[in-house]
Regions:
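Glycine-rich phosphate-binding active-site loops on the catalytic face of alpha/beta enzymes
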Residues: 46-48, 75-79, 90-112
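Conserved anion-binding
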Residues: 1-49
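Structural motif corresponding to alpha-helix initiation and N-cap regions
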Residues: 23-27, 57, 80, 107
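Catalytic cores of alpha/beta
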Residues: 58-93, 113
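Short, basic/aromatic-enriched C-terminal tail that caps enzymatic domains
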Residues: 106-124
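Short, well-ordered secondary-structure micro-motifs
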Residues: 14-17, 52-55, 83-85, 108-110
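Short, basic, helix/turn surface patches
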Residues: 2-12, 70-77, 98-102
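Glycine-enriched alpha-helix->loop->beta-strand junction motifs that scaffold or abut catalytic
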Residues: 1-2, 37-39, 66-70, 88-96, ...
Length: 124
């Protein structure tokens, strides 16, 4: 199984460690990867990543609605509420969420997040 990561800002793919905006549309690139048989997309909104200011739910769900393959949300998770909000979009094609800094800084307990997901969502 191949899962591809797309890092984007304002809907455009960022490259070379987020230094450059490629002007390539994230949705268009996702559709190409879908055509190539990629299993899932990890979508990171780089304006949110590491900032712990919440996931860009609108952009992530918009991408998920435009393609058939599942999308894993990444960037900005700050607390359990962010996980609850993005998980509510499971039927839109959101298959998971990546948590980084919020775990390292103990803003989220992995057990609490997993228990919530196990009780509330089909994919778990």
């Amino acid at each position: 199984m191949i899962i591809v990561g797309i890092d984007a800002k304002n809907g455009e793919v960022a490259t070379e460690g987020w230094k450059f905006n490629s002007k390539l549309d994230a949705i268009a690139l996702s559709k190409k990867f879908e055509d190539y048989g990629v299993a899932e997309i990890v979508y990171t909104d780089i304006e949110k990543d590491g900032m712990m200011k919440g996931i860009n739910i609108e952009a992530t769900v918009n991408l998920a609605n435009e393609i058939e393959i599942p999308v894993i949300a990444s960037g900005g998770v700050s607390n359990i509420e962010d996980i609850k909000k993005i998980s509510a979009h499971e039927t839109d094609g959101i298959s998971g969420v990546i948590i980084g800094r919020a775990l390292y800084e103990e803003k989220i307990k992995i057990q609490e997040a997993q228990e919530f997901l196990n009780k509330n969502y089909v994919g778990n």
